[in-house]
């Protein structure tokens, strides 16, 4: 149902062209800003003040976290019992929602996050026991470049067993596997959890046979495939 409510989307200037075109396709109002958290926040505040729009944070908003948790909920409803679930971690919204939904439905399920080695702020945060901001990330996974928020961090630190980091090379291998064997178009960020599950580190874990992997997005520029 169309409600004719305008949507204002703040995006970094270096956002992939395919993502900008997708937002334009939904007729949203795009405002580009410098690719920093400070610039995004300031631009968002200016737009909200000017238009009176309700601000929806992309991952730290509780309603967004709840909505993303339905991915895990539907997977468990369809498959049933799982030994473990793995999902990518960027801002942490999807992983947080996954933790809450999965833990309420399968109390003993083991929860793992997956991150690129070149953007491993969540991994560093979990190991050090405090929120570590992202610092100069370098990875092909443009969807996982942002830092976690306070809300997502507080959820993840209480529920994740571990975060497994993978190289861009491992991510590309996993991405190719999904394209070729499953015939699904995914972006590099989406391949991160499969890459994590394929690592010796994960394979050496005991008592894990049935694994749920959440595939998160296909915003890929076909002219710039990494393989």
Name each region found by the language model.
Residues 1-227:
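PLP-dependent amino-acid enzyme catalytic core
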């Amino acid at each position: 149902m169309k409600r004719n409510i305008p949507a204002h989307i703040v995006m970094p200037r270096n956002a992939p062209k395919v993502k900008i075109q997708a937002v334009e396709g939904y007729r949203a109002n795009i405002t580009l800003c410098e690719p920093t958290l400070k610039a995004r926040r300031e631009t968002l505040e200016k737009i909200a003040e000017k238009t009176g729009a309700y601000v929806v944070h992309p991952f730290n908003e509780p309603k967004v976290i709840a909505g993303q948790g339905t991915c895990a909920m539907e997977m468990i409803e369809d498959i049933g019992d799982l030994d473990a679930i793995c999902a990518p971690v960027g801002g942490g919204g999807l992983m947080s929602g996954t933790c809450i939904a999965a833990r309420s439905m399968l109390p003993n399920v083991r929860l793992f996050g997956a991150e690129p080695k070149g953007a491993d702020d969540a991994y560093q945060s979990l190991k050090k026991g405090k929120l570590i901001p992202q610092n100069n990330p370098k990875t092909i996974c443009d969807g996982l470049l942002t830092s976690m928020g306070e809300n997502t961090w507080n959820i993840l630190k209480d529920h994740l067993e571990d975060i497994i980091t993978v190289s861009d090379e491992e991510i590309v291998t996993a991405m190719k596997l999904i394209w070729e064997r499953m015939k699904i178009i995914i972006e590099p960020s989406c391949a991160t959890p499969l890459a994590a599950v394929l690592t010796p580190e994960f394979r050496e874990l005991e008592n894990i046979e049935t694994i749920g992997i959440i595939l998160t997005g296909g915003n890929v520029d076909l002219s710039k495939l990494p393989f």
